[in-house]
């Protein structure tokens, strides 16, 4: 370990064939991954158009038929012979760093592949009822032309409703609406016994409603969700604010950009995002919805960031460090998906020249490479290399600890840029897996309200500085230290990422009381794998799965300090 004044000193690392393969992986990406990605995106687009051409009545009829198939499949499972229930989705399709190793053990597949339709957009109730495989690109394409939107639209097009609910989802509007699951009005779940139930905040299944988020699909199978809509305008008026100083100063500049010290709610923007480019420089962005008439007024600049030849968004934002604060108008849907084309800044590692003018104009229209195809074209050695030499982690920390988190990341990982996105963590009537610090409402900290503590997602996505310099780096050990720091600081780690937590530590980070009560009440034990074991790193044999499920009755979190 090191302290802030004494950085970690690492020896040089001997290169292997994997290093060279990763360095020249762009050849496979250009000639295989990008063409296939573009083809897949086009076919998916045609499928979405076909779905939208159907009447809502037709879509509902198909939905009902597919739900019956799921129920029949579950009821046909022999608990004494068949493995635990998993979806039939292939491991490489998921957008995440986990290997989905639990599917390597014998398991009982239930196919949810047909659940990809928008079932209803209700302008009176201001809700959208959608199936779990509807993705963010699909729903924003359907709603934004109506001047409507989900309250929280995760940035990457391929992220699905089911993943954002069962796992974790955030966006620049989360400082108002909370995480993606906080905007869901109702879940439609098929339970272990084949019963279809509708869970809301205030019906008989309210406990299930609060237990579903972060459960990774281990309480039941999500077949539909009713999600809150908000009214939006055609453009986002975006202000780029450069901030310079040490990491604590950057953190305070970020906090001040959206959380007024006087508590005046009229000063709170519609969207917030921060990017820290190095230990002394960052750019904070605040956005408010704007009409087409306002955007097109003389003197206002419109930036269509979605065009394939445009500079990558994070690099465009970085220009504020040289030219100072500036304002521009971005079409709303293009703003929502501003990080899709370059996958935040991971595109720079995948295609080192992908941000160059010539590439953007000639081949930029093929971007981004589909994450699932990137995973499908890497073997075990490459996958392990990324786990060891690369970081893709999110640290959810209380807002007042953002500066400490930035210092920790700099000291232990030295990864830049760093993404900052605030979100409310609501004090719920029933405590779920994640929850605010006890007594936060009495501290009157900047950004907090009576019903929610303000948190921030500190997004760490890139190769550490020591790896870029050819030095040694132990990715597993770094993640273990990160998880320890999060537990000590009442933070949380989204489980789409690779986790090194043992079971006891997992239930120190997360609250398992409601989850375990629902596992027993709705008979998920013996049918669905536990959330810890589903998130656990490494291969799993059928014997291990069975033993873990048996041991789950004596939960590790009951022993937690």
UniProtKB/Swiss-Prot annotation:
Q: Does the keyword Transmembrane helix apply?
A: yes
Reported consequences of knocking out the gene: Dwarf and reduced fertility.
| Alphabetic keyword roster | Calmodulin-binding, Endoplasmic reticulum, Membrane, Microsome, NADP, Oxidoreductase, Phosphoprotein, Signal-anchor, Transmembrane, Transmembrane helix
Q: GO: which molecular function terms? A: calmodulin binding; Delta24-sterol reductase activity; FAD binding
Per the record, ranges on the Lumenal side are: 1-25
Keyword flag Protein transport = no
Q: Which Pfam families does this chain map to?
A: FAD_binding_4
**Ranges for region Interaction with calmodulin:** 518-539
Catalytic activity reads: lathosterol + NADP(+) = 5alpha-cholesta-7,24-dien-3beta-ol + NADPH + H(+)
The effect of residue 531 to D is: Decreased calmodulin binding and partial loss of function
Coiled-coil residue spans: none
Q: Which InterPro entries match?
A: Diminuto-like, FAD-bd_PCMH, FAD-bd_PCMH-like_sf, FAD-bd_PCMH_sub2, Oxid_FAD_bind_N
Membrane topology term reads:
Single-pass type II membrane protein
Known EC number(s)? 1.3.1.72
Single biological process term from Gene Ontology: unidimensional cell growth
Which ranges carry the FAD-binding PCMH-type domain? 49-232
Residue(s) carrying Phosphoserine: 2
Name any GO cellular component annotation.
Answer: cytosol
Q: Where in the cell is it found?
A: Microsome membrane
Self-association or partners: how does it assemble? Answer: Interacts with calmodulin.
Q: Any idea what this protein is called?
A: Delta(24)-sterol reductase
Q: What is the lineage of its organism?
A: Eukaryota, Viridiplantae, Streptophyta, Embryophyta, Tracheophyta
**Gene encoding the protein:** DIM
